[in-house]
């Protein structure tokens, strides 16, 4: 235990304080993949332009036993249940991403896909809200669904529909759905005014229903308690819905609602360390702060300033500048809980991203109890979280499926883990799916492109195993806030500088060393006068000071410039005084990382290390080309 603690402290010192450096990540590719994931989660009749070809129609009789059409919507995660509360939060945050960064989405060719993803959800919500005071909040139940491991196209589990009404209220569910519809009405205001008006009509009705008939939805839909329990209650959703209805309508009624109920409903009292499908206060506080910065506080300015104080305490806690800070892993990732921690990473990163822009708009810094934070520093923090997700972490693992080379291959997801229904229509039985597909150790037959899995534990450890649902199960609400962050990071079209400042290097920042001719000859080496086909380029990407000592982060790129595949690789590294990631140590040398067995012609691999000295001496001591 002592050695583990020592190592953790060392890594905290070395990584936790790292300031953001310019990254080589392809945010545009990550954005495209993260939006594509929603097509894999679709329920209902799939459209002709469906891009995830291994999926097919499913849930075609949902709602029939209740006399209502509930075909459509999204499966929330790796199961086949349609849970209304997280689905609505997913749609709300997708809409917020589009509202803030629609220009960037459009310039990168993804706005249409993002809007389609929203409409797939809102079309379902319209069906689920057949009367002003009736809302269907779940189709299927977790208990029977989790007993089986089947493709959604042929599931045999119970598809009962569950609703809330005036006698069985659910203010949190109705409030969140009202927020989703209101936010979506903004998204469709220009492209489809009539649809926007329809969404707004549902939003008004749902808010009135939520506010008039109060109660927690999981007291009415009790089958949801084990899976999406409403721990925070419904006051946050009522404020959240009012905030979005004000954004959509500019109606003073909703502004007054936020002003008059902020204190009694917790909007001005709760200082949060999370934002997600259950707890909305940080989101409410951020939206109200935006209203205040736009000069629209009016008679409620004093109350709105208290909202803003709580929003800024949340932002300060993200950067370790508050009296109560959000915990992070040694590698620097926000850590809230073991089960699907990544949902809190993306949602907090999104709030930090939009707040950095709000601060820039109002030309002010964030005043924290432990020091001030500039808008660019807040954006740098969001970027650091995204870069961690995409592979800049102690394991050099991408937690977005299909991005990079080292990403999860055994995702806890029924559809991706079973051969596509379009390829093999042989029936997969309820329990047979566990025996044949869940328990197999190979990679998923269908790549769940863009899925953001639950992620590592508190010590940056991760096990890519299908039964490790806490870490390998994805969810729609993991991806939704990420859309906005990625869109913001891609370009500077908002007018804010995307080239974030870095620390000027003290040692020589770039060292390019051709690998020497190998001593042994598994293949014929090049002539002595010829350059080696395996080259190494080192670059100092960041530096920071801790307790008077300067630490440096180096990125090392090894490139195969030959016309053949590099099969055997031995790297000699000397004068290394800190941790290294992205290679495997074998004896006194290093080789390919565990997820790589060879390096094709023209390709490169990267590994990184941190220490408080000039670059280490890195040489290729042996290699084989085939």
Curated annotation (Swiss-Prot):
It is found in: Secreted. One of its GO terms (molecular function) is carbohydrate binding. It comes from the Eukaryota. It catalyses: Endohydrolysis of (1->4)-beta-D-glucosidic linkages in cellulose, lichenin and cereal beta-D-glucans. Residues 526-536 have a biased composition (Low complexity). Coiled coil: none annotated. Glycans are attached at residues 560, 622. Residues 515-536 are annotated as: Disordered. It is an enzyme of class 3 (hydrolase). Its EC number is 3.2.1.4. GO terms for cellular component: extracellular region. PROSITE patterns: GH9_1, GH9_2, GH9_3. Its main location: secreted. InterPro entries: 6-hairpin_glycosidase_sf, 6hp_glycosidase-like_sf, CBM_49, Glyco_hydro_9, Glyco_hydro_9_Asp/Glu_AS, Glyco_hydro_9_His_AS. Belongs to the glycosyl hydrolase 9 (cellulase E) family. This is Endoglucanase 19. It comes from Arabidopsis thaliana. The lineage of its organism: Eukaryota, Viridiplantae, Streptophyta, Embryophyta, Tracheophyta.
